Amino acid sequence: MSTGFNAQSFLRMVSSSAGVYRMYDVKGDVIYVGKAKDLKKRLSSYFRKNLGNVKTQALVSHIHHIDVTLTHSETDALLLENDYIKQYMPKYNVLLRDDKSYPYIFLSQHEHPRLAYHRGPQREKGYYFGPYPNGGAVRESLHLMQKLFPIRQCDDLYYKSRTRPCLQYQLSRCSAPCVGKVSNAEYDEQVKLASLFLKGKDKQVISELVAKMEEAAGQQAYEQAARFRDQIMALRRVAEQQEVSGNTGDMDVIGVHYASGIACFHLLFIREGKIFGSRSYYPTVPAQTDIEEVLRSFLLQFYLNADIQRTIPKEVVISHHFEELHELEAAVSEALNKKFSIKTNVRADRASFLRLALTNATNAVMTRLSHKNTVEQRFVLLEEILELNAPIQRMECFDISHTMGESTVASCVVFNREGPHKAEYRRYNIEGITPGDDYAAMKQAISRRFDKIDASGKIPDILFIDGGLGQLRIAQQIVDEKFVNLDKAPQLIGVAKGESRKPGLETLIFGDTETSFSLEDDSPALHLIQHIRDESHRFAITGHRNRRQKTRNTSTLESIPGIGPKRRKALLQHLGGLQEVKGASVAELAKVPGISIEMAQTIHDALRG
């Protein structure tokens, strides 16, 4: 493919300074961002006669023009390169898609502080402990905290509405400060101990509790002493279960495995010498990318991504050495304004952690490769059965979900040769049809999916319809209309359930000829079809349930005379949810801002009647 780019003319004008270059294709999209100590030398290497790397050959064949930006130093070039990669997400760069904020445990500054899961901007006043590697680690820690410290985890609205202790008090997981079952001094002491524990100072917590136990026993307050004893025993069990290292302090330990185009970076987050959590990252790696670039690109983006709430330690241990390691250290140190070091040759505890991280990374890649090979085999078999001339690159499946015509939702799920492509999933809220009319729902969904479709759009090779011949005909009619002026159109296949609706008894129907066929119930190709069908059903039904619940919550209250959107919102926010509103007394309802005693009586009668 020739784009008309004159490399010789361009290279004559390029400086030998440090800087960053952006390569564009004929459409004006940035397809690659790189940095260099010597721009002329680096860019000249792309246009040698014999390019050994297949990826580089493909990249060069798509270059339409190149922009360069000079920098004062190679460190500045690294920082700018990272900014450009985040901005343009070029197709030939290794991309780390880590755009989720990290979760924390939040301790509020309320009179009776609460512990809670938090993700996102830290706007509320209080203390944030973390970040944790994932939501599961936070929930597990909160569950543990409930067993160790009787501190509330309910939200403030629920706390305000209590007139008697909740179930957590009966389970000894909360001291019920909402109804005065504990003094402020005792509650504050437990909050202080919980805070110390979350900071990793469990030995200090235990020693303080031992002192309190002995003091209570000396005062013959044996019941209180027994509670302290039980708390000490629970804390000691937790301390024994946690893997503790001598003097390792805070660091990230990264095991890397790269095979057959799949890279896994498995991180162990070591804080206060303990394994605080772990997380695997799978950056998008263009074909034929070498391990050096994968390593450099991942570390560059991971540790220079200012949009991510993450505490970055001073030390990182990684399983592989790479050429630009020291330049990357300098760039991160400058960006963070603190010392930052990357180590590869380590011993003792660090080596033990590194072996663990590397084992996890290797296992993760092997598992993904096994899954990828299985999916690939299923695609190949399906192509053979359908006698297709070209490989299937994209499949979509539509399903409709509703309850007796209520809150109808259509789903569209997408599979590529690696399996589900969840970023491309779509839901359609169906409006303006006769309730329960699945044909009209399918017509609306397919019409919206392919509205204004053109040759450059995302056209599926196969479009599955979860339904019988009637829905398939409607879908085929819409596709014929939308693709009448295009060279390519999807092959439609209906997936009709058998009489007993058991998996393996499905009938498959071609949309264009309406001929039907079946596959053996142990056919891998059928398993692929069942997978995409089941995924579309799951995605549709979860969307329908969410929409139905939202509609019912709204309609239940707004059907009461005098209750509009504002009062409904005030009731739900103040009391904590629809069930709490239904269970509230007239007096409790009247405490809600904007609700008079007469209105409270009306609401109470309507919901109880």
Curated annotation (Swiss-Prot):
Residues 203-238 form the UVR domain. It holds the Pfam family UvrC_RNaseH_dom. The keyword Membrane does not apply. It is found in: Cytoplasm. One of its GO terms (biological process) is SOS response. Gene3D superfamilies: 5' to 3' exonuclease, C-terminal subdomain (1.10.150.20), GIY-YIG endonuclease (3.40.1440.10), UVR domain (4.10.860.10), UvrC, RNAse H endonuclease domain (3.30.420.340). Keywords: Cytoplasm, DNA damage, DNA excision, DNA repair, Excision nuclease, SOS response. One of its GO terms (molecular function) is excinuclease ABC activity. PROSITE patterns: GIY_YIG, UVR, UVRC. PANTHER family: UVRABC SYSTEM PROTEIN C, UVRC/OXIDOREDUCTASE. The UvrABC repair system catalyzes the recognition and processing of DNA lesions. UvrC both incises the 5' and 3' sides of the lesion. The N-terminal half is responsible for the 3' incision and the C-terminal half is responsible for the 5' incision. Interacts with UvrB in an incision complex. This is UvrABC system protein C. The gene is uvrC.
